[in-house]
Amino acid sequence: MPRPGSAQRWAAVAGRWGCRLLALLLLVPGPGGASEITFELPDNAKQCFYEDIAQGTKCTLEFQVITGGHYDVDCRLEDPDGKVLYKEMKKQYDSFTFTASKNGTYKFCFSNEFSTFTHKTVYFDFQVGEDPPLFPSENRVSALTQMESACVSIHEALKSVIDYQTHFRLREAQGRSRAEDLNTRVAYWSVGEALILLVVSIGQVFLLKSFFSDKRTTTTRVGS
């Protein structure tokens, strides 16, 4: 016969390990209502994306230019009837939240048509609707168990960690791009200075040589 209290201890251990296992499963990405894409936008180009959204759905569009030029891009969002919901010119990053007023296909475009020479790398995150509940009982009046409440808290914390990591990666990529661009400019400037110094040195050598060169004088006899 098991000793008194052993069942409670085993239940507590099982609960802790079950919560840990569920936390590990939450780390695996699953289906959701968000689309994250990083794409190349050439110069004089425009790229559009389309999303079917139901009426009353809350959506958020967030974008950031990672590399290229002045790190800016034009963004435009339209509803199914072509009405402009959001429009910004030459923005480095921004976020816009709206609620779909009707069913249909919504379009959002990124434009680099104002740039003639530089292409851009653009990241955007388009979130449609709310995440589904972790447990079916979340939508009911009944209270969650202690394990379910802990797992929900872990799930929310993990989502915050993922958001922070995404923003940190974007900042790191943008900072690396700026550093590489600055390094290239410094290298070109150093090569230019070296060439100028070489030309000046050669000019000085020829100038000094002309000062010490022998000048032959010619004499003319005048006959009487």
From Swiss-Prot:
Post-translational modification remark: N-linked glycosylated in complex form containing terminal sialic acid.
Spans within the Cytoplasmic topological domain: 209-224
Motif COPII vesicle coat-binding positions after renumbering to this chain: 211-212
Domain of life assignment: Eukaryota
Cellular component per GO, a single term: COPI vesicle coat
Record's keyword terms, sorted: Cytoplasmic vesicle, Endoplasmic reticulum, Glycoprotein, Golgi apparatus, Membrane, Protein transport, Signal, Transmembrane, Transmembrane helix, Transport
Membrane topology: Single-pass type I membrane protein
Topological domain ranges for the Lumenal compartment: 35-187
Biological process according to GO: endoplasmic reticulum to Golgi vesicle-mediated transport; Golgi organization; intracellular protein transport
Entries under SMART domains matching the protein: EMP24_GP25L
Residues carrying sugar: N103
Domain annotation GOLD: ranges: 46-128
UniProt motif (COPI vesicle coat-binding) ranges: 211-224
Transmembrane feature ranges: 188-208
Subcellular locations according to the entry: Endoplasmic reticulum membrane; Golgi apparatus, cis-Golgi network membrane; Endoplasmic reticulum-Golgi intermediate compartment membrane; Cytoplasmic vesicle, COPI-coated vesicle membrane
Secretion signal, residue range per the UniProt entry: 1-34
Role, per record: Potential role in vesicular protein trafficking, mainly in the early secretory pathway. Appears to play a role in the biosynthesis of secreted cargo including processing and post-translational modifications.
Subunit field text: Predominantly monomeric and to lesser extent homodimeric in endoplasmic reticulum, endoplasmic reticulum-Golgi intermediate compartment and cis-Golgi network. Oligomerizes with other members of the EMP24/GP25L family such as TMED2, TMED9 and TMED10. Interacts (via C-terminus) with COPG1; the interaction involves dimeric TMED7.
Entry's family note: Belongs to the EMP24/GP25L family.
Name of the protein: Transmembrane emp24 domain-containing protein 7
Organism listed in the record: Homo sapiens (Human)
Gene this chain is encoded by: TMED7
